[in-house]
Amino acid sequence: MKFNYDVIVIGGGHAGCEAAAAAANMGAKTCLVTIDMNKIGQMSCNPAIGGIAKGQIVRETDALGGQMGLITDATAIQFRMLNKGKGPAVWSPRAQCDRGKYIWKWRETLDAIPNLDIWQDQADELLVSDHEAIGVKTVWGISLYAKSIVVSAGTFLNGLMHIGRHQYPGGRCAEPAVAHFSESISKWGISVARMKTGTPVRIDKRSIHLDEMEEQPGETDFHQFSYMGTPRQLRQLPCWLCYTNKDVHDTLRSGLADSPLYNGQIKSTGPRYCPSIETKLVTFPDKDQHPLFLEPEGENTNEMYLNGFSSSMPMEIQLEAIRKIPAFRDAKTYRPGYAIEYDYFAPTLLDHTLESKIIRGLFLAGQVNGTTGYEEAAGQGLVAGINAALRCGGGNERFVMNRDESYIGVLIDDLTSKGVDEPYRMFTSRAEYRILLRQDDADARLTEKAYRLGVAKRDRYDWWLQKKEWIHRILQVCDNTPVKPADINPYLENIGTAPLRMGCKITDLIGRPQLSIQGLTPILPALREITDQLPNRKEEIMEAAEIQIKYKGYIERERIVADKMHRLENIKIKGRFDYNSLKEISTEGRQKLTKINPETLAQASRIPGVSPSDINVLLVLLGR
C-alpha cells in the first residue's frame, strides 16, 4: 500500500510530536509514524520538564506556537523557578509532571490537529531518489511518500540496553529497537556513531520511609511555562531529598566488575552532566555522599523516580545499595535502572534548518543529532517541522534563529558548527547573550515571527500584542512620573534603603535592588492606577516591565555586541570558496571549513580550529 503526504515524521517522542504538530498547524498534510500510539510524548527518563536553560527552551518553544509548555502546565504536579536567587538572565522554570497524563495530553493535542494522521508502525527504510528523500518504507510493507521527511527516532536506532552483563536490543524498556533504518541513511554518506544514556531504578512509594527524608515542596506563585496561562489542574506534590553513604558506595564498588560501563561492554560516550551513580564513585572517589532526589511519577501512582541514581549495574547490586540508605531500607522496586546505546548522526552535516546537506528533504531532530534532554529535542523538532512544512510550499523561505534570538538558535548553531563527541546538554553558559534570552521575554523575541509563519495562532499573537502594550504603558508611567522625597522617604527608611535627597522618576526608584513595582504600587498613585487597569496576568506583566527597567543598561550593552556580530552573520560564504586552495588559511582551518562548509562568516568564526587570522583572510578575500 502507498500513501502520500507533505511531511512524514518518524518517531513520536518530544522532537517528533513538536515537528508533527508544527507542520500540520502550518497546513502541511502530515503523518506521524510511531511504534506505540499509547506512548506518544513519553518521558523516558525523569518525569520532569525544564531546568537550567532547558526551561528557557520550553518557553521559546511555547512562544513559537509549540505544545510542550501547554502540556506541561496542564499535567504539572510541582513547579519551581530555579536560580531565583540570581539575576533574571538565568531564571529557569522546572516542573514535575504526571507521566501518564502527560502522554495522554499529547495524544489529545495531536488528535485535535487537522491535517495530522498518526500511523502505528516501525520505519524500516528511508526512500531516496537522486539524493532527495521521497518517503519511508515500514516493516509492515507500507510505503509512505512525502516532500519532507523528519527523523526523530530518539534512542531507538539500533538501541542496545544493558543491565549488568545482560544486554538485549531495545529502544526503551520493553520496547523494540529499530534495526535497519540507520543503515538506509548512513549508506548515503551521512556519518553515524554511537552514544549512551541511562535511567535509574523506579521505587514503590509505599516501601519508603518518607519521614526520614527532607521534603521539598513546590512553589505556588504565578510562573508557568506557557504564555497562554493554562491553569494548574492537578494536585501539587512534594519531592524528597536524601543522600548516599559509605555503605552504599562500598556495595556499588563491589559490583563494578559487572558494570557494563567498566567491564568493556559499553564503549560509547554518555552524558557528562548526568553521570551514572557508578561513574560518580569512580570520578569522585573521595566524596562520602551524593544527593538523591525522590520524584513522584504522577498524581495517582506509587511509582517514584530516584533522581541521581542512574545505573546499569546488576539488579541485585542496585537493590542492595539502595537498601543501605536508611529511608530505603525496605525498598521495593518496579524495574531496574539500565543503560542504552544508540545511533546518532553527525549534526555538522545539517544546515541551520536541520535539513541534511547530503539528502535534500531529510530533516533530523532530537537525540539522533547527539543531544540529550526532552527540551532540546522539542526545540529541534519544532524547527525541523516548521522548515519541513516550508519546503513543501515550494518557495525559498527558511526558518532560522540566530544566537541572540533564542537558546534553540544557540543549540542548533553549536550542533551544526561544532558537532558533538558526547551527548549535548544546554546550559545558560553556552549562550553569550543570556540577558537577551531570558525566560520572561521569549514571546517578545519569537511570537510575531511564528505568527507570520502560521505556526503560532491568532489568540497567542493577540495576547502578546496586549502584553506588549501594557508593558509599554507601565514603562511610560515609570519614566515620566516624578516622585517627591516627602512622598517616598518614609517607605524607603522603613525597608532600610537610602532616602531621596531630591526628586526622581519612578524608574530611578525601581532601579534600586531593594525596590519593586509590586512593593511601590500601594504607595505611588500613578503606579497603582496603571497596574489596577491590567486585565489579567498582572504579576507576569509587572515582572516583565520591572526586569526591563532594572536591567536596561545591561540589555542595551548586550544588544550592541549582538548587533556587531550580526554584521558577520549577514556575510554569506557558503559555496564561495575552495578552502583547500587558500594556503593563507591554517591547515586545520582549511580542513574544518571544508568539512563544515559554513553558511556565514559568523558561523565560520565559531568553528573550533578556525582562528581569528583565518577569518581575517576570508574578510580580505571578500573585500571587507
Enumerate the predicted regions with their spans.
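Beta1/beta-strand and adjacent pyrophosphate-binding region of the FAD-binding site
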Residues: 2-15
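Conserved N-terminal/central alpha/beta ligand/cofactor-binding core
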Residues: 4, 21-125, 140, 152-172, ...
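Short hydrophobic core segments
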Residues: 10, 143-154
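A glycine-rich dinucleotide-binding beta-alpha-beta segment and adjacent secondary-structure elements
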Residues: 305-371, 400-413, 538-592, 597
